[in-house]
Swiss-Prot record:
Protein name: ATP synthase subunit a
Assembly notes: F-type ATPases have 2 components, CF(1) - the catalytic core - and CF(0) - the membrane proton channel. CF(1) has five subunits: alpha(3), beta(3), gamma(1), delta(1), epsilon(1). CF(0) has three main subunits: a(1), b(2) and c(9-12). The alpha and beta chains form an alternating ring which encloses part of the gamma chain. CF(1) is attached to CF(0) by a central stalk formed by the gamma and epsilon chains, while a peripheral stalk is formed by the delta and b chains.
Residue intervals passing through the bilayer: 26-46, 84-104, 114-134, 143-163, 193-213, 216-236
Cell compartment(s), UniProt: Cell inner membrane
Family: Belongs to the ATPase A chain family.
Gene3D superfamilies in the cross-refs: ATP synthase, F0 complex, subunit A
Presence of the UniProt keyword Ion transport in the record: yes
HAMAP family noted in UniProt: ATP_synth_a_bact
Superkingdom as given in the UniProt entry: Bacteria
Keyword Transmembrane helix carried by entry: yes
Organismal lineage: Bacteria, Pseudomonadati, Pseudomonadota, Alphaproteobacteria, Hyphomicrobiales
A GO MF label: proton-transporting ATP synthase activity, rotational mechanism
Length: 250
């Protein structure tokens, strides 16, 4: 295993594929994107395939996840937001599963790749724009015109709102990417201290106790962050979808 804390984020080809000079290689990132989707879908399928009146653990988790996102959508976008439940629920489960899989040794954390998180953010913003214009036409542009703004300040406020809207995919993607990247690098550094000090013998083993405690604590924290980042991504998605459903409502 490499001592470089950034080595874990390198994209490596598993099956090299080149078509017309374009690289379509199947990589470790491709593998774990597929694995994240498969694990999330598989868990939901098997946990609900034999539904019981008194649910077991897996069924309870699946039902709690469903209700969690449904309530989040109702609070963030109103009852009309429930039409986007498949999108938000799929994003939440995919991001959460990808984050959790990345916690295991030798596994790849796809949410530590800015291109992956940016693609997810673009999917969200594209949905907002397409639905907003489809449902409201050019009245959707009212999302850039907050109510109660004095006329003299309106041009400035509209410009700020447009810039804020355009920055959403950047902030949405960078937030997830940066948190997963920083957390895994920190965890790798402390784990490296444990291995390096342990290799020094008895004295080193004694000195490795503190880094080991920090590694265990950070591991627990990273599992919490894995959930929180999926939660934040879903919450912000609901907020953005609310603009498409109720433009000019802020």
């Amino acid at each position: 295993m490499s001592n470089d804390p950034t080595h874990q984020f390198l994209i490596q080809k598993i099956v090299p594929i080149e078509i017309g000079g374009i690289d379509f290689s199947f990589t470790n990132a491709s593998l774990f994107m597929a694995a994240s989707a498969a694990v999330a879908a598989g868990f939901l399928y098997f946990s609900t395939s034999n539904r019981a009146i008194v649910p077991g653990r897996s069924q309870s988790v699946a039902e709690m996840s469903y209700e969690f996102i449904a309530n989040m959508l109702k609070e963030g976008a109103g009852k009309q937001g429930l039409k986007f439940f498949p999108l938000v629920f799929s994003l939440f489960m995919f991001v959460l599963t990808a984050n959790l899989l990345g916690m295991f040794p030798y596994f790849f954390t796809i949410t530590s790749q800015i291109i992956v998180t940016f693609a997810l953010a673009i999917l969200v913003i594209s949905t907002v724009l397409i639905y907003g214009f489809y449902k409201h036409g050019f009245h959707f542009l009212n999302v850039f015109v907050p109510s109660g703004v004095p006329g003299i300040l309106l041009p400035l406020v509209v410009a700020i709102e447009i810039i804020s809207f355009l920055s959403r995919p950047i902030s949405l993607s960078v937030r997830l990417f940066a948190n997963m990247l920083a957390g895994h690098i920190t965890l790798k550094v402390f784990a490296g201290f444990v291995a390096s000090l342990g290799a020094l013998g008895a004295v080193g083993v004694g000195g490795a106790v503190l880094p080991l405690i920090m590694t265990v604590a950070l591991t627990g924290l990273e599992f919490l962050v894995a959930f929180l980042q999926a939660y934040v991504f879903a919450v912000l998605t609901c907020m953005y979808l609310n603009d498409a459903i109720h433009p000019g409502g802020h």
